[in-house]
């Protein structure tokens, strides 16, 4: 099953790229629905490249398991892609048999950028979890648009 966002962000591609690599931006985009906390207690200033960061999560204040964030970057022409090879490690989302998350930004002629966010999940639990994931992705997209409008 797939959740997709295709949005215009009111910032240039450099700012959007920085936001995709910022733990603070992720926390803002997910709040107050999902509250992650680093297992080791310390937030990095940026996500380390190709290194898994373990996070304990709370959804709407209720413990909801552990996930990892592990970013790998790719550039295809003027499109910059982040592959998050992390995913659920425990909790309800761990019932999914696969989790593939990609985000991409590309410049628009007017100086803003296009943001695409795609999550593919599978498994017996996917149909039941899809509505919640879809709603969370819509919220993330809205909050990222708010953050992109702010001065960097």
Regions found by a protein language model. Name each.
Residues 5-7, 66-74, 86, 99-107:
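Hydrophobic/aromatic beta-strand elements that line small-molecule binding cavities or substrate pockets
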Residues 15-20, 26, 105, 115-117, ...:
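Hydrophobic pocket/interface hotspot
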Residues 81-135:
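Beta-strand/loop substructures that line and gate deep hydrophobic ligand-binding cavities in soluble
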Residues 1-8, 52, 66, 98-100, ...:
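Intrinsic-disorder/low-complexity, polar/charged segments enriched in Ser/Thr/Lys/Arg/Asp/Glu/Gln
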Residues 12, 76, 108-111:
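Short strand-connecting beta-turns/loops that link adjacent beta-strands
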Residues 34, 38, 146-152:
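Short, highly charged C-terminal tails/helix-capping segments
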Residues 1-48:
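Hydrophobic ligand-binding cavity/cleft-lining segments
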Residues 38-90:
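Glycine-rich portal/gate segments that line the openings of hydrophobic small-molecule binding cavities
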